[in-house]
């Protein structure tokens, strides 16, 4: 109910363009049922509830169809922690996870995604009028360049010398550093020498 009608139209447009089967599931009763029990629910928290409700449906449908659920988060969102924990970034396979937002745009253009979809302002569409760049206080076109240089170990002075401001650099570094927990497995209290993910490690799951 909170989503823009345009998002629904674009979903059907993309499905039609690529010949993809589409099934629409209304999560409004799920979300509003919880909201009715939680009178202090803020728009931000409700947005997280909606994202997690989508995942309930996605994983149930994947089991029903014996299919693999795919994630949609891109590298910029993941580095910024700009996603709902146990929401959009939950699926076991994420084809876009190592592509910055600007790279996703170029890939979309290359694949023939309709221009009105590629050019629309990025938004989670969980709160009316919300946009990614307003939330982040930074344009993706600038954020991605800073992120790439920061991850490769370039100095602050070098990055600032590319024409970015100290405030832009601070925002990027702060978001990356304070959201590391969202990109990691749950923290486990180590009580044995066989703790999973710490001492018990598999080099690679592989099928001959």
Predicted feature residues:
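Short secondary-structure transition/capping segments
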Residues: 8, 35-37, 82-83, 128-132, ...
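Catalytic subdomain that performs nucleotidyl-dependent activation
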Residues: 16, 46-54, 67-148
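Short coil/loop linkers at secondary-structure junctions
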Residues: 21, 114, 165-166
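Peripheral terminal appendages
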Residues: 131-208
